[in-house]
Amino acid sequence: MTNHWDVIVVGGGHAGTEAAAAAARLGAKTLLATHKLETVGTMSCNPAIGGLAKGHLVREIDALDGVMGRAIDRGGIQFRILNRSKGPAVRGPRAQADRALYAQAVRAILADQPGLTLAALAIEDLLIGNDGRCAGVIDAEGGVHRAGAVVLTTGTFLRGVIHIGTQTTPAGRIGEAPALGLSATLARLGFPLGRLKTGTPPRLDGRTIAWATLESQPGDEPPPPFSFLTTAITTPQISCAITETTAETHRVIRENLHRAPLYSGQIQGVGPRYCPSIEDKVVRFADRDRHQIFLEPEGLDDPTVYPNGISTSLPIDVQLALLATIPGLEKAEMMRPGYAIEYDFVDPRCLGPTLETDRLPGLFLAGQINGTTGYEEAAAQGLIAGLNAARVAGAGERAAPITFDRAEGYLGVLVDDLITLGTTEPYRMFTSRAEYRLLLRADNADLRLTAKGIALGCVGAARTAAFEDKRAALTAARTMIDGLALTPPDLARRGIAVNQDGQRRTPLDLLCHADIDWARLVALWPELGAIRPDVAEQLEIGARYAGYLERMHGDVAAFRRDEALVLPADLAYDGLANLSAELRGKLTLARPATLGAAARIPGMTPAALTALLRHVKRRERDSVEECFT
């Protein structure tokens, strides 16, 4: 095997697979190095993809020809649209996965990717060139692998430690060794490291669960795919089930809190605020006597069940005792105990918008190493890091950065939040984090991003053709609709009351009426039934929310004006006397690329922004004057 590559990606999880595939799609000769090839694409925790805001990320990854959407469509065994009864901005696709089928799909997609090689290697160190750039990696056997750029996607493996009661085990995932050398290397290079914690629930034997006594939770029919390339889901579908904890469950937990590593002081890392362990729920929400649990089968031919909602690191005997108090699980057998895992992460404020590090050019970080939680957040970062690693490896500093701003997608919101605000707890994406969420819907991710992907060169021929077909279908549908305009008397004869103002109205004009939807339009104009469902959805949303969308486009224009005001990379914030010491410190740490990014730093005031803008303009003026003296 060659020891020189354009891009080397370390780690075969969700961030690593997207990074490697993205780099290869841009033509980079890419190596994906991971401990075990059989674990590539493994779902370490919950067997599901998507959800609120997370589903938006998956659709955006797919719009740029990424892996995750296609893989879950092949391996998904239950598909749902969450928040279907709410507005389109907050609807999120989610799919339950067959773990084995999902991992197989990921590996198959990677195997079909030209220019990508996978190798079982334990990477222990980084290679630094004489020019101070990251020049490759060194494996556990001392082998040197050179590259133009390196992407670290180490997940929970950086100095990972598993906790089950008082028992601690160094591991990156249960049964797998941690990455100790890389953590030491990052510390030696001066990267600011922190410690985070996440957890997983016990796995249950589904054959010992009393399913008949539980509430069933079926998926949507027909199953809504993730990928814009998928026409239909062909994998057999299953139902999940719902149960809940009881007062007795909470008593068992409270009586054993002294044995919980989370409360004994054994765990120092900060856990995810929005995905707490069951012991944390019982303490934080002491007034509640029950918490919902979703019983999620892990595969069509696998009896393992994932009880979503009872992540725990309590001792095994306590886990068994609390399971026996839950309806339907009284006789359930535990196949594997739940556990917590602590791991190192890097403060993401030392990254730029391409996810390249400021301390070591040529090194990119993606996934949980940047303080995030969730498969989808990791995959999104992997995509961005992989694309930029390929550009840097091919063109060096001349490479135009590949970035996404907050008005382009959740991809941009995610990266901007991380590099501007940093995080002290595992970061999770929510629709509430996106200011322009009505524009950044899951349903229009391809219309927002695929053209950009085509221009960048990361979108293949099949997706390009599908995208052009959809755009042509939208144009044809609008032309047809414009020819269906009717006068108020004509509409009245069809049972639709409008102002008798003499103005002709198209079918889309009528969607501002709360009682009129697309189905009613088709009943009135049968020819509309020939329009593709995905195209009809775009037309309906665009018409129904036209006023809101127009105002939001105005907001985006104002946002882009601020983003266009670039702050010099070498700006010495310590010398800005008009700013408080606190703000000078925050600006020095975050080093925002634009005035807009500076405005999003906590504590930044309008007065401080004005002072910053004046300083930059004065500096530019002085620089121009020097050129003529």
From Swiss-Prot:
UniProtKB keywords: Cytoplasm, FAD, Flavoprotein, NAD, tRNA processing
Biological processes, Gene Ontology terms: tRNA methylation; tRNA wobble uridine modification
Cellular component, GO annotation: cytosol
Ligand binding (FAD): G11, G12, G13, H14, A15, G16
Single GO term (MF): flavin adenine dinucleotide binding
Any Pfam family the entry gives: GIDA_C_1st
Keyword presence, Cell membrane: no
Cofactors demanded by this protein: FAD
Coiled-coil residue windows: none
Location of this chain's protein in the cell: Cytoplasm
Domain of life the protein comes from: Bacteria
Keyword Flavoprotein: yes
Record note on quaternary structure: Homodimer. Heterotetramer of two MnmE and two MnmG subunits.
Function: NAD-binding protein involved in the addition of a carboxymethylaminomethyl (cmnm) group at the wobble position (U34) of certain tRNAs, forming tRNA-cmnm(5)s(2)U34.
Family: Belongs to the MnmG family.
Name the UniProt record assigns to this protein: tRNA uridine 5-carboxymethylaminomethyl modification enzyme MnmG
Organism, as annotated: Rhodospirillum rubrum (strain ATCC 11170 / ATH 1.1.1 / DSM 467 / LMG 4362 / NCIMB 8255 / S1)
